Design a protein with these regions (language model features):
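Core catalytic lobe of class I
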Residues: 1-271, 298
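Class I S-adenosyl-L-methionine-dependent methyltransferase module
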Residues: 107-108, 271-298
C-alpha cells in the first residue's frame, strides 16, 4: 500500500503524527524523512496536549512523546533508507535548577536507537554567535558576562543533523544522475556545514504579507535541499512528521520528489498547503522543455 496515489504529488495529514504513524500510515512507505522536531519547553506551537513543545519535563513528558514518535517513524521508513533529524541543544533555565543545557541531541539519538533505527552520523551546522546573542539575549554569549565573570561563558549553540538508517537492505539504490556532483560531495562531506544561510527559510521566501502564517523556527532551505538530493531519488516520497508551513515539502517538490507530511496546528497546515501548491507549480513550469512551449506566432 502506498502513501500517495500514482498521480498525487503531495498530501498533508492534519493531526497528531504519532498515532498516524503507528496506526494509519502504511508500514515501510517512506523513502526518506527529514524534519525538525518541536523543542520541549523552548517553543510552544499550540495549546494542545499532543504538542511536544508543551512538555515541560525533558526527562518525563518529552521523553515519553518522543519514544512513541520514534517507534512510529521506524515503522513507516523503508528498510535501508535514511532519516535526518534537525535538533539543537536546549538551554536549561533556572527553574530547572542550574543554568546549563539539556542534551536534546543525545535524547533523540538514544530514543531513535531504542526504536530500532541505526545511528550513523551527525553534521554540525554553524551559527553566528553575535546574531544568536542578540536574538536570545543569552548572558553566556554577551560582552556583559565576558567582562564581569567569565565562569559561565560558552560558545553559541550550533544545529545538529542526526542521521539514522532503518535496518535492512535498501532495495532501490539512491544513484540518480546529476543530483550530487563530486565537488558538492567534497564540500558536504565536511563535518561542519559553515556555508548555510541562516535567513534562507520559507518564512522569508514565501511569507509576503501579514496574512501569511510564519513558522517560529523554520529549517533552512539549504539544509533541506542538500539532504533531499543526497538521500532520495526523483519521484520518491519525502516525509516530514512535523511539516509546519511546509519547508521540507517545498524543497522536495521543487527537486522532483513527492511529499507527505503531518501537521497539528490548523494555521500551519493551511499555509503548508499554499506553499506546496506554489512549489509544485514552480517545478512544473521549470520542467517544461522547448517542445512543451506553445508555438511562436509568426
Amino acid at each position: 500500500m502506498n502513501l500517495l496515489s500514482d498521480d498525487q504529488k503531495y498530501a498533508v495529514h492534519h493531526g497528531d503524527c504519532i498515532p498516524h504513524m503507528l496506526e494509519e500510515m502504511p508500514p515501510a512507505s517512506v523513502d526518506f524523512s527529514v524534519f525538525s522536531p518541536p523543542f520541549p519547553s523552548l517553543f510552544s506551537y499550540t495549546s494542545k496536549a499532543e504538542d511536544i513543545g508543551n512538555s515541560e519535563n525533558m526527562k518525563g513528558e518529552a521523553k515519553i512523546h518522543l519514544s512513541y514518535f520514534f517507534r512510529g517513524l521506524a515503522r513507516v521508513l523503508k528498510p535501508g533508507r535514511a532519516v535526518v533529524v534537525h535538533v539543537m541543544q536546549i538551554p536549561r533555565l533556572k527553574r530547572s535548577g542550574e543554568v546549563g543545557l539539556h542534551d536534546y541531541r543525545g535524547l533523540n539519538i538514544r530514543l531513535g536507537e531504542r526504536a530500532g533505527l541505526v545511528y550513523e552520523y551527525d553534521w554540525v551546522v554553524r551559527k553566528n554567535p553575535q546574531a544568536q546573542a542578540i536574538r536570545t539575549r543569552s548572558r553566556e554569549l554577551q560582552f556583559a558576562g565576558l567582562e564581569s565573570d567569565r565562569a559561565k561563558q560558552r560558545g553559541c549553540l550550533p544545529d545538529y543533523l542526526i542521521k539514522f538508517r532503518a535496518p535492512g537492505e535498501n532495495e532501490v539504490a539512491i544513484d540518480s544522475d546529476g543530483d550530487v556532483s563530486r565537488n558538492e560531495w567534497i564540500d558536504w562531506a565536511e563535518c561542519c556545514w559553515s556555508d548555510i544561510r541562516e535567513t534562507n527559510t520559507l518564512n522569508v521566501k514565501e511569507a509576503r504579507s501579514e496574512e501569511d502564517t510564519k513558522h517560529i523556527c523554520p529549517l533552512q532551505l539549504d539544509v533541506i535541499d542538500r539532504l533531499v538530493r543526497l538521500y532520495s531519488n526523483p519521484g520518491e516520497v519525502v516525509f516530514s512528521p512535523f511539516t509546519g508551513i511546509g519547508s521540507e515539502g517545498y524543497v522536495s517538490l521543487q527537486q522532483g520528489r513527492r511529499f507527505y507530511g503531518c501537521e497539528l496546528k490548523p494555521e500551519y497546515h493551511a499555509q503548508a498547503l499554499k506553499n506546496l501548491a506554489k512549489a509544485e507549480r514552480t517545478h512544473q513550469a521549470n520542467s517544461r522543455t522547448l517542445f512543451d512551449a506553445p508555438e511562436a506566432v509568426a
